[in-house]
Protein backbone atom coordinates (compact mmCIF):
# COMPACT_ATOMS: atom_id res chain seq x y z
CA UNK A 1 0.00 0.00 0.00
CA UNK A 2 2.82 2.37 0.91
CA UNK A 3 4.45 1.88 -2.50
CA UNK A 4 1.11 2.47 -4.24
CA UNK A 5 0.63 5.75 -2.37
CA UNK A 6 4.14 6.88 -3.31
CA UNK A 7 3.47 6.03 -6.97
CA UNK A 8 0.18 7.94 -6.86
CA UNK A 9 1.87 10.98 -5.32
CA UNK A 10 4.55 10.97 -8.01
CA UNK A 11 1.91 10.69 -10.75
CA UNK A 12 -0.05 13.60 -9.34
CA UNK A 13 3.10 15.69 -9.11
CA UNK A 14 3.91 15.00 -12.75
CA UNK A 15 0.38 15.87 -13.85
CA UNK A 16 0.53 19.06 -11.83
CA UNK A 17 3.67 20.13 -13.66
CA UNK A 18 2.11 19.47 -17.08
CA UNK A 19 -1.34 20.97 -16.62
CA UNK A 20 -2.26 24.26 -14.96
CA UNK A 21 -3.96 24.08 -11.61
CA UNK A 22 -7.73 24.27 -11.60
CA UNK A 23 -8.78 27.89 -11.88
CA UNK A 24 -5.26 29.06 -12.76
CA UNK A 25 -5.25 31.89 -15.29
CA UNK A 26 -2.90 32.04 -18.25
CA UNK A 27 -0.98 34.92 -16.66
CA UNK A 28 -0.52 32.90 -13.45
CA UNK A 29 0.59 29.87 -15.46
CA UNK A 30 3.15 31.90 -17.41
CA UNK A 31 4.42 33.63 -14.27
CA UNK A 32 5.08 30.22 -12.72
CA UNK A 33 6.55 28.49 -15.78
CA UNK A 34 8.23 31.38 -17.60
CA UNK A 35 6.92 29.94 -20.86
CA UNK A 36 4.18 30.98 -23.29
CA UNK A 37 3.05 28.04 -25.42
CA UNK A 38 1.47 28.87 -28.76
CA UNK A 39 -0.18 26.67 -31.36
CA UNK A 40 0.77 27.58 -34.91
CA UNK A 41 1.27 26.11 -38.37
CA UNK A 42 4.27 24.50 -40.01
CA UNK A 43 3.10 24.85 -43.62
CA UNK A 44 1.22 28.15 -44.03
CA UNK A 45 3.68 30.67 -45.48
CA UNK A 46 4.16 33.43 -44.63
CA UNK A 47 2.09 33.27 -41.41
CA UNK A 48 3.84 30.26 -39.90
CA UNK A 49 6.01 27.70 -41.65
CA UNK A 50 9.34 25.89 -41.55
CA UNK A 51 11.73 27.57 -43.98
CA UNK A 52 14.61 26.12 -45.98
CA UNK A 53 16.94 26.64 -43.02
CA UNK A 54 14.59 24.53 -40.87
CA UNK A 55 13.54 27.61 -38.88
CA UNK A 56 9.95 27.93 -37.68
CA UNK A 57 9.08 31.47 -38.74
CA UNK A 58 6.32 33.72 -40.02
CA UNK A 59 4.22 36.84 -39.61
CA UNK A 60 2.04 35.41 -36.82
CA UNK A 61 5.10 34.19 -34.93
CA UNK A 62 6.76 37.60 -35.31
CA UNK A 63 3.68 39.32 -33.88
CA UNK A 64 3.89 37.10 -30.81
CA UNK A 65 7.66 37.51 -30.41
CA UNK A 66 7.85 41.25 -31.12
CA UNK A 67 4.57 42.50 -29.63
CA UNK A 68 2.96 40.06 -27.22
CA UNK A 69 5.97 38.42 -25.55
CA UNK A 70 7.56 41.71 -24.38
CA UNK A 71 4.23 42.88 -22.94
CA UNK A 72 3.77 39.54 -21.22
CA UNK A 73 7.27 39.57 -19.73
CA UNK A 74 6.65 43.04 -18.34
CA UNK A 75 3.28 42.00 -16.90
CA UNK A 76 4.54 38.91 -15.05
CA UNK A 77 7.83 40.61 -14.15
CA UNK A 78 10.10 37.90 -15.52
CA UNK A 79 11.66 36.76 -18.76
CA UNK A 80 9.24 34.63 -20.78
CA UNK A 81 10.31 32.11 -23.40
CA UNK A 82 8.22 31.11 -26.40
CA UNK A 83 7.38 27.47 -27.08
CA UNK A 84 5.69 26.48 -30.35
CA UNK A 85 3.47 23.47 -30.99
CA UNK A 86 1.98 22.52 -34.34
CA UNK A 87 -1.72 23.22 -34.80
CA UNK A 88 -4.22 22.66 -37.61
CA UNK A 89 -7.91 23.53 -38.09
CA UNK A 90 -9.05 20.23 -36.57
CA UNK A 91 -6.70 20.37 -33.56
CA UNK A 92 -6.34 24.00 -32.49
CA UNK A 93 -9.45 24.33 -30.31
CA UNK A 94 -8.75 21.00 -28.53
CA UNK A 95 -5.15 22.16 -27.97
CA UNK A 96 -6.48 25.26 -26.22
CA UNK A 97 -9.24 23.67 -24.20
CA UNK A 98 -6.94 20.86 -23.01
CA UNK A 99 -4.39 23.47 -21.86
CA UNK A 100 -1.74 22.09 -24.22
CA UNK A 101 -1.24 25.62 -25.59
CA UNK A 102 -2.04 29.10 -24.28
CA UNK A 103 -2.62 30.92 -27.55
CA UNK A 104 -3.38 30.04 -31.16
CA UNK A 105 -1.38 32.35 -33.42
CA UNK A 106 -1.92 31.41 -37.04
CA UNK A 107 -4.55 31.64 -39.78
CA UNK A 108 -7.65 31.15 -37.63
CA UNK A 109 -10.83 32.92 -38.66
CA UNK A 110 -12.86 34.48 -35.87
CA UNK A 111 -16.40 33.05 -36.21
CA UNK A 112 -19.54 33.06 -34.07
CA UNK A 113 -19.52 29.28 -33.75
CA UNK A 114 -15.87 29.20 -32.65
CA UNK A 115 -16.58 31.88 -30.06
CA UNK A 116 -18.73 29.32 -28.27
CA UNK A 117 -15.53 27.39 -27.46
CA UNK A 118 -12.75 29.99 -27.34
CA UNK A 119 -12.20 33.75 -27.12
CA UNK A 120 -10.52 35.81 -29.82
CA UNK A 121 -8.27 38.82 -29.90
CA UNK A 122 -8.99 41.78 -32.12
CA UNK A 123 -8.68 41.11 -35.85
CA UNK A 124 -5.06 41.23 -36.99
CA UNK A 125 -5.49 40.19 -40.64
CA UNK A 126 -8.31 40.23 -43.18
CA UNK A 127 -8.62 38.03 -46.25
CA UNK A 128 -11.20 35.85 -48.03
CA UNK A 129 -11.55 32.48 -49.74
CA UNK A 130 -10.42 31.78 -53.30
CA UNK A 131 -9.14 28.81 -55.32
CA UNK A 132 -5.68 27.61 -56.29
CA UNK A 133 -5.64 25.83 -59.66
CA UNK A 134 -3.16 24.71 -62.28
CA UNK A 135 -2.73 27.24 -65.07
CA UNK A 136 -5.27 26.54 -67.80
CA UNK A 137 -7.85 24.98 -65.47
CA UNK A 138 -11.32 26.35 -66.38
CA UNK A 139 -12.29 26.99 -62.75
CA UNK A 140 -12.73 30.75 -62.39
CA UNK A 141 -14.61 30.98 -59.11
CA UNK A 142 -17.40 29.62 -56.96
CA UNK A 143 -19.82 29.52 -59.89
CA UNK A 144 -17.73 26.99 -61.83
CA UNK A 145 -17.03 24.20 -59.30
CA UNK A 146 -20.27 22.18 -59.49
CA UNK A 147 -19.31 18.53 -60.00
CA UNK A 148 -15.61 19.34 -59.61
CA UNK A 149 -13.23 17.74 -57.09
CA UNK A 150 -12.30 20.43 -54.58
CA UNK A 151 -9.76 20.13 -51.77
CA UNK A 152 -10.13 21.91 -48.43
CA UNK A 153 -8.71 21.54 -44.94
CA UNK A 154 -10.63 19.63 -42.30
CA UNK A 155 -12.39 21.95 -39.88
CA UNK A 156 -11.88 25.05 -42.04
CA UNK A 157 -14.45 27.73 -42.78
CA UNK A 158 -13.67 27.19 -46.48
CA UNK A 159 -14.90 23.58 -46.36
CA UNK A 160 -18.12 24.66 -44.64
CA UNK A 161 -18.79 27.36 -47.23
CA UNK A 162 -18.31 24.94 -50.14
CA UNK A 163 -20.72 22.44 -48.56
CA UNK A 164 -23.32 25.16 -48.01
CA UNK A 165 -23.02 27.11 -51.26
CA UNK A 166 -22.15 24.39 -53.79
CA UNK A 167 -23.36 21.05 -52.40
CA UNK A 168 -22.84 19.41 -55.81
CA UNK A 169 -19.08 19.99 -55.64
CA UNK A 170 -17.09 16.89 -54.69
CA UNK A 171 -15.38 18.10 -51.53
CA UNK A 172 -12.31 16.24 -50.28
CA UNK A 173 -10.95 17.33 -46.89
CA UNK A 174 -7.31 17.01 -45.86
CA UNK A 175 -5.64 17.35 -42.44
CA UNK A 176 -3.40 20.26 -43.38
CA UNK A 177 -2.34 22.58 -46.18
CA UNK A 178 0.67 20.57 -47.45
CA UNK A 179 -1.53 17.48 -47.86
CA UNK A 180 -4.20 19.45 -49.73
CA UNK A 181 -1.64 21.03 -52.04
CA UNK A 182 -0.04 17.65 -52.71
CA UNK A 183 -3.45 16.29 -53.75
CA UNK A 184 -3.82 19.22 -56.14
CA UNK A 185 -0.32 18.80 -57.56
CA UNK A 186 -0.93 15.08 -58.13
CA UNK A 187 -4.24 15.67 -59.90
CA UNK A 188 -6.45 14.09 -57.23
CA UNK A 189 -8.48 17.32 -57.14
CA UNK A 190 -9.06 20.12 -59.62
CA UNK A 191 -8.81 23.02 -57.17
CA UNK A 192 -7.85 23.76 -53.61
CA UNK A 193 -9.85 26.32 -51.67
CA UNK A 194 -8.36 28.34 -48.85
CA UNK A 195 -7.95 31.97 -47.91
CA UNK A 196 -6.46 33.97 -50.75
CA UNK A 197 -3.38 35.06 -48.83
CA UNK A 198 -2.54 31.46 -47.93
CA UNK A 199 -2.94 30.38 -51.55
CA UNK A 200 -0.64 33.21 -52.60
CA UNK A 201 1.87 31.85 -50.10
CA UNK A 202 1.63 28.34 -51.52
CA UNK A 203 2.05 29.63 -55.06
CA UNK A 204 5.08 31.73 -54.09
CA UNK A 205 6.78 28.78 -52.37
CA UNK A 206 5.94 26.17 -55.03
CA UNK A 207 8.87 24.76 -57.07
CA UNK A 208 7.31 26.29 -60.22
CA UNK A 209 5.14 29.25 -59.10
CA UNK A 210 4.10 30.15 -62.65
CA UNK A 211 2.32 26.80 -62.98
CA UNK A 212 -0.34 27.97 -60.51
CA UNK A 213 -3.10 30.57 -60.48
CA UNK A 214 -5.09 32.01 -57.57
CA UNK A 215 -8.54 32.09 -59.18
CA UNK A 216 -11.81 33.87 -58.57
CA UNK A 217 -13.04 36.79 -56.52
CA UNK A 218 -13.10 36.55 -52.73
CA UNK A 219 -16.21 34.58 -51.79
CA UNK A 220 -16.00 34.89 -48.02
CA UNK A 221 -14.87 37.26 -45.28
CA UNK A 222 -12.08 35.79 -43.14
CA UNK A 223 -11.01 37.98 -40.18
CA UNK A 224 -8.04 36.35 -38.44
CA UNK A 225 -7.76 36.59 -34.67
CA UNK A 226 -5.56 34.97 -32.05
CA UNK A 227 -7.55 32.46 -30.01
CA UNK A 228 -7.30 31.79 -26.29
CA UNK A 229 -9.24 30.03 -23.56
CA UNK A 230 -12.61 31.49 -22.65
CA UNK A 231 -13.17 33.67 -19.60
CA UNK A 232 -9.54 34.72 -19.22
CA UNK A 233 -10.07 38.45 -19.61
CA UNK A 234 -6.74 39.62 -18.18
CA UNK A 235 -4.74 37.61 -20.72
CA UNK A 236 -7.07 38.56 -23.55
CA UNK A 237 -6.71 42.23 -22.64
CA UNK A 238 -2.91 41.92 -22.59
CA UNK A 239 -2.91 40.36 -26.07
CA UNK A 240 -5.27 43.02 -27.42
CA UNK A 241 -3.33 45.92 -25.94
CA UNK A 242 -0.06 44.49 -27.29
CA UNK A 243 -1.57 44.25 -30.78
CA UNK A 244 -3.04 47.76 -30.50
CA UNK A 245 0.33 49.14 -29.45
CA UNK A 246 1.96 47.41 -32.43
CA UNK A 247 -0.59 48.93 -34.81
CA UNK A 248 -0.41 52.41 -33.24
CA UNK A 249 3.40 52.50 -33.14
CA UNK A 250 3.73 51.25 -36.72
CA UNK A 251 5.55 48.08 -35.67
CA UNK A 252 2.70 45.97 -37.06
CA UNK A 253 3.07 47.58 -40.50
CA UNK A 254 6.84 47.07 -40.44
CA UNK A 255 6.28 43.35 -39.87
CA UNK A 256 3.60 43.31 -42.56
CA UNK A 257 6.04 44.87 -45.02
CA UNK A 258 8.68 42.28 -44.07
CA UNK A 259 6.40 39.37 -44.94
CA UNK A 260 3.87 40.78 -47.44
CA UNK A 261 5.62 43.79 -49.00
CA UNK A 262 6.99 43.97 -52.54
CA UNK A 263 10.25 42.38 -51.36
CA UNK A 264 8.60 40.13 -48.78
CA UNK A 265 8.13 36.39 -48.72
CA UNK A 266 4.62 36.63 -50.20
CA UNK A 267 3.80 39.99 -51.81
CA UNK A 268 0.22 40.83 -50.80
CA UNK A 269 -0.40 44.59 -50.75
CA UNK A 270 -2.56 45.96 -47.95
CA UNK A 271 -5.54 48.00 -49.11
CA UNK A 272 -6.25 51.41 -47.64
CA UNK A 273 -9.54 50.07 -46.28
CA UNK A 274 -7.79 47.26 -44.43
CA UNK A 275 -5.25 49.65 -42.92
CA UNK A 276 -8.02 51.95 -41.69
CA UNK A 277 -9.93 48.97 -40.29
CA UNK A 278 -6.89 47.86 -38.30
CA UNK A 279 -6.30 51.37 -36.99
CA UNK A 280 -9.95 51.79 -36.00
CA UNK A 281 -9.59 48.85 -33.59
CA UNK A 282 -7.11 50.82 -31.48
CA UNK A 283 -9.05 52.26 -28.55
CA UNK A 284 -7.86 55.30 -26.54
CA UNK A 285 -5.46 54.69 -23.66
For each feature predicted by the language model, list its residue ranges.
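Extracytoplasmic small-molecule ligand-binding "clamshell" domains
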Residues: 23-104
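Beta->alpha turn/N-cap motifs
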Residues: 40-44, 85-90, 99-111, 135, ...
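Acidic, polar ligand-binding/catalytic clefts
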Residues: 65, 77-144, 281-284
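A ligand-binding cleft/hinge motif common to bilobed small-molecule-binding domains
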Residues: 91, 105-116, 161-164, 178, ...
Amino acid sequence: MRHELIALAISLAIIGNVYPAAGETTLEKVKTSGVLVIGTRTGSPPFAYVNKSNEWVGFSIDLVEKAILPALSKKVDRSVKLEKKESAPATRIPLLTSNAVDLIAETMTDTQSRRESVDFSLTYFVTGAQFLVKKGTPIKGLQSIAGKRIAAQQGSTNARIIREKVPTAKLLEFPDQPAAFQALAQGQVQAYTNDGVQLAGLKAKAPRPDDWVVAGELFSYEPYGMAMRKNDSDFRNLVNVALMDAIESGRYFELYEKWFGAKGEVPYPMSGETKRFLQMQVVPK
